[in-house]
Amino acid sequence: MDQKILSLAAEKTADKLQEFLQTLREGDLTNLLQNQAVKGKVAGALLRAIFKGSPCSEEAGTLRRRKIYTCCIQLVESGDLQKEIASEIIGLLMLEAHHFPGPLLVELANEFISAVREGSLVNGKSLELLPIILTALATKKENLAYGKGVLSGEECKKQLINTLCSGRWDQQYVIQLTSMFKDVPLTAEEVEFVVEKALSMFSKMNLQEIPPLVYQLLVLSSKGSRKSVLEGIIAFFSALDKQHNEEQSGDELLDVVTVPSGELRHVEGTIILHIVFAIKLDYELGRELVKHLKVGQQGDSNNNLSPFSIALLLSVTRIQRFQDQVLDLLKTSVVKSFKDLQLLQGSKFLQNLVPHRSYVSTMILEVVKNSVHSWDHVTQGLVELGFILMDSYGPKKVLDGKTIETSPSLSRMPNQHACKLGANILLETFKIHEMIRQEILEQVLNRVVTRASSPISHFLDLLSNIVMYAPLVLQSCSSKVTEAFDYLSFLPLQTVQRLLKAVQPLLKVSMSMRDCLILVLRKAMFANQLDARKSAVAGFLLLLKNFKVLGSLSSSQCSQSLSVSQVHVDVHSHYNSVANETFCLEIMDSLRRCLSQQADVRLMLYEGFYDVLRRNSQLANSVMQTLLSQLKQFYEPKPDLLPPLKLEACILTQGDKISLQEPLDYLLCCIQHCLAWYKNTVIPLQQGEEEEEEEEAFYEDLDDILESITNRMIKSELEDFELDKSADFSQSTSIGIKNNICAFLVMGVCEVLIEYNFSISSFSKNRFEDILSLFMCYKKLSDILNEKAGKAKTKMANKTSDSLLSMKFVSSLLTALFRDSIQSHQESLSVLRSSNEFMRYAVNVALQKVQQLKETGHVSGPDGQNPEKIFQNLCDITRVLLWRYTSIPTSVEESGKKEKGKSISLLCLEGLQKIFSAVQQFYQPKIQQFLRALDVTDKEGEEREDADVSVTQRTAFQIRQFQRSLLNLLSSQEEDFNSKEALLLVTVLTSLSKLLEPSSPQFVQMLSWTSKICKENSREDALFCKSLMNLLFSLHVSYKSPVILLRDLSQDIHGHLGDIDQDVEVEKTNHFAIVNLRTAAPTVCLLVLSQAEKVLEEVDWLITKLKGQVSQETLSEEASSQATLPNQPVEKAIIMQLGTLLTFFHELVQTALPSGSCVDTLLKDLCKMYTTLTALVRYYLQVCQSSGGIPKNMEKLVKLSGSHLTPLCYSFISYVQNKSKSLNYTGEKKEKPAAVATAMARVLRETKPIPNLIFAIEQYEKFLIHLSKKSKVNLMQHMKLSTSRDFKIKGNILDMVLREDGEDENEEGTASEHGGQNKEPAKKKRKK
């Protein structure tokens, strides 16, 4: 039969073939086809013949085709056919599909849809036919019966697609079904059906099956619905990430983790690559991605951003067209996230309303962590983002040349956090990705070298961390580091020091790098620039510290803790200690040459030698011998000669120029510290060992010299130095400059000898008498210099250099003076205690050291760079100062003795204030340890019991002591009130209050105590009032919103200053006694306005957040109506805040404020108030349809603004302008040009915000009209539209002024400017 059909088909006409086919029974043809296909014979040719003999022009032929199609589809799905045969059959069916009439196409399509929905497909091969059927159907123009109605082919296709997408899809055919739609012409609506269906299948599929489905979706997105595709993919993987993190965070209920981490990351990586590839082919997709993620920035950026979407954005940066805008989007998101965090941390009001969320910074670092799973496409974007953040938000140079570094007040700023995040991104990326390391290192070094004039500490910190992580790995990049060495001579000293310190571990593992550095340093030592020479000294000293000679004491013996990286390097590099000794001695030889260079170079050497000894004790002889031979040049060996030092030799005279050549005081200081260290550390370890006599004599020599200098300095008079009162100390003559230098040298030597004698005194009375004699020499010179500087009306001579006393000594001295109660010490200590001036000097030096720590992060002198030692000294000093201040109050001390300068108690308090600030700045993690050290009752045995005492409890104990002191001060009469001490006490309390936990009872007690002080004490000191009120506000905002407090204060201000209407008598409320006629304005007024501004900022932030949520949730009316319910508490809080603030402004706009900053600030804040009200109205314009109107409390707020604020604003404007006119008038009368100019400038400043305010009011009213129409509530009934504003321009007056143009050009110009400013809002009002 098959042969006959084939032979008939070979004829030119199909008539005989048709006739033959009609004679066959129904099942014969299908059975024949089935047998032929299964056997793998000529099924294709047979099928072509059947189609040729079954033309669609005849009904019989059409039905036969229909049956053959059904048979073939079943055959292909059965899986019995060979692949080639099945493909051939499907190909033929595709070719013939277009010949089918519409109704049969509909039937065929329904068959497919039923098979898909019922899951009866076996292998899905036949699905390749469905897109052809749907395409063919869309081309049919005639109307077709579908369901109960009649539809066109296009409409039928739409219904069929809808039916298909609304039914069940078997998991294994999802990809195939999605893929087939790319071959069907689809409308936007049809694409949306398909996309929604495919996205809904994500959660039902195996993870490995999602990438190919995403690929098909991206191909399909070229037809439309790009936004839905991207949103769906991002939302799914963001949710999966969140679920995965929750599972990994150790939820005990989840025994099995849903998805292994590695598998999830690989799948995400593949999908990101698919999307990036799709964007390269379709830029519209990229624009849609950026647009979608940008929307999130308007509200809450954390809603749209997730680790997955961030990784996707970073990968997109590889496409040039999107690189800048994507990095800019990420940069903006990071800073916005940190600003939001800052705002939340500073306000309890916001914390109660906004739940804690993960921040963009955390997500980005998670991306870095995830990128270990072969996400190479993300790394370049991470590196670029890291450098952009560091470049944009690193420390900046300010006007006086100083750098704004990370300090406590600034470290919480968003910019600082963003810069730190950039460094963390780069460091973590460096650790994970080997291929990118060289690029990161190169870019960091480039910035260090090329931006020397800008602050680059953040890049040096990053470099240090990179080197610390893997010094051995970086050997491969050593060429980059050695290139940087070539620029050392041209870099600032501080940069050189930090750069060399950062790369120091590399020098231990790379000898070639070390040799290269030495060559560079030797050249620099003889460079013309002073900074280059100093850099050479810094470099050599660093090498001496870190290349230990065999036999040197270990770091523990030297009480010097080395960094983990250093130990790491030491373990891995078995360097030759003998070679090190030769190397170090060569360097010492080079450094000796520096002793003939400028004073600054020598000074660096003296300051560095002590650290060299501690780290490399075997160099002690070499160092000490160098120092001794240098000292002998300036030491007078004859025991009877006075003075004992040759000061003339320390000064260099070149023509008229006089300068210091030898910093003798620092040389002696260095000798004294090195000698003390050697005696305390090395000699005890050498006891019992035979030591060369020469060495013993050596150290005895130094002791003898210091002893001789001490004795002769005590005997010397100022005349011996030619520095008595009659000497010339002016800065304008060469003799004066020389005498100043000598005076400072003598004072420095005295300080060094004071410390030396105290260290060897063993509490000997004679030694202490010597110390006092040395101090008196110091004091005399200091007094002369101050007196001469005072007469010359210049503070040049008073700029004393840092004290040469070490911080450790200051700590020991203060403890001895104020806390030593050992009986055997009392007689000798009474010598020092008898001099108040000496005790004041000791406290002053402690203050100087703490100030130095606050400004630079370290102190001068030994261990000044060691944070641990500094912290220990700080604890000891604080304990003493605290005891001294609380034991002997200032009032007691000052009543006893009337001396010039501050009392010791006041100095102690000032010291405490500086220390509390410094500890929070540099030792935040050690606060607990610090507070425990202050507890005088603490004993070592009790430490374990006290370990669980919280920081808050310890802080509260300290706070109570200062509260008592302040109460005692406030109980005194106004004339006896010590404002300096009060101010310091409030500053200390403010500093300590930051350590209290806001939820603790101690915090509440502190707040109520501060509030009580403000309510019950009236002081006219403006600075004290300001600091106390600032404390009150800072506590209040951490506990609850300050709006009620602001309202009460505004009533007090109104009561004291009176009303703008002089006929109105204001009732005085007196909530806070601290507000009085002297402090009400400008002090308290400006403070409350500043706080009001912060509240408005918070409210504005909340409104923006709500608006962002609404714009994202308006996908459907149902979604948005459900979304408004959780927002109700936030809306209510916003309205409550604005309502109370409205009453606050209601009081202030009626207050007769003095001209100046108060009026100016009030007008600006009123403008902000109306802008915020407008923002709220616009929010309700967005939501009022879905939420069913506006809430009643919003109506009340609008009513309040119309009755209590707007009319009063216009009255206040009139009041301000009337005051301006009176000022003008009085200015003209006096006819003093300077006075007139000043008055006019003030008028201009105060009236400038008026047009802005009027415009803000009118904008508010404009949007209220829109809201009234939309909500069907008449909100404007409460608004009194002013028609008689006296700031409108009157035509006749304007003409008169214009005619007088030539008479007074300046004055008239100003008036017309005012007119122009005020005219615009008035016009707008008339337009309404």
From Swiss-Prot:
Pfam families hit by this protein: FANCI_HD1, FANCI_HD2, FANCI_S1, FANCI_S1-cap, FANCI_S2, FANCI_S3, FANCI_S4
Cross-link (Glycyl lysine isopeptide (Lys-Gly) (interchain with G-Cter in ubiquitin)): K523
Record localization: Nucleus; Cytoplasm
GO cellular component: chromatin; cytoplasm; cytosol; DNA repair complex; membrane; nucleoplasm
GO MF annotations in UniProt: DNA binding; DNA polymerase binding
This protein's UniProt keywords: Cell cycle, Cytoplasm, Disease variant, DNA damage, DNA repair, DNA-binding, Fanconi anemia, Isopeptide bond, Nucleus, Phosphoprotein, Ubl conjugation
Annotated stretches, region: Disordered: 1300-1328
Membrane-crossing residue ranges in chain numbering: none
Principal subcellular localisation of the protein: nucleus
Family, as annotated: Belongs to the Fanconi anemia group I protein family.
Annotated disorder: Fanconi anemia complementation group I: A disorder affecting all bone marrow elements and resulting in anemia, leukopenia and thrombopenia. It is associated with cardiac, renal and limb malformations, dermal pigmentary changes, and a predisposition to the development of malignancies. At the cellular level it is associated with hypersensitivity to DNA-damaging agents, chromosomal instability (increased chromosome breakage) and defective DNA repair.
Name assigned to this protein: Fanconi anemia group I protein
UniProt source species: Homo sapiens
Organism classification: Eukaryota, Metazoa, Chordata, Craniata, Vertebrata
